[in-house]
Amino acid sequence: MAAFTNTATLTYNNQTRNSNIVTGEILEVLTATKNVIGANYHVGDTLTYVVTVVNSGATAITGLTLSDDLGAYTFGTGTLTPLDYVEDSLRYYTNGTLATTATVTAGPPLTVTGISVPAGGDATIIYQAKVNEFAPLTNESSVKNTATVTGGAQTLTAEATIAVSAEPELTITKTLCPQTVVEDGQITYT
């Protein structure tokens, strides 16, 4: 919640008087949360993100924009983005009903415009991102992904963090050459 103060000044006949200071409080009507489905990642995994914006006010809020940094971080003098938005994966719901009015720009950053949140209701934006080669893979690394919602009275931010998998992602393949062998023949496994 944000607080504000106000003072009145009265000037008459070269005399100035200040009033007492009054303090008010601005109640935040919108809140945002962000979650990632899953506990950890490997390169190539597809992650699902859920951003929910709740309107506790009595008036619908329209024209909101969601911007997702897709986990961008500074590396040297540049910026790397470890997640790629999965094209056409975004679904936008108002009060649980699929809506179609939002416009998506893949980015980075991922940008969703035209979001509306009904009075006393919520908007839920669900989308997928694929982990790419810029995701950190060292032990105890993670991708912190931040969503920002603008267009309301205040800017909202919500974060979701997912850790790299501590288990290696191993695969093994065995081949036999030749596949057909005569008795006392020789074969090679690789």
Model-based region annotation:
Residues 1-190:
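Exported/extracytosolic protein signature
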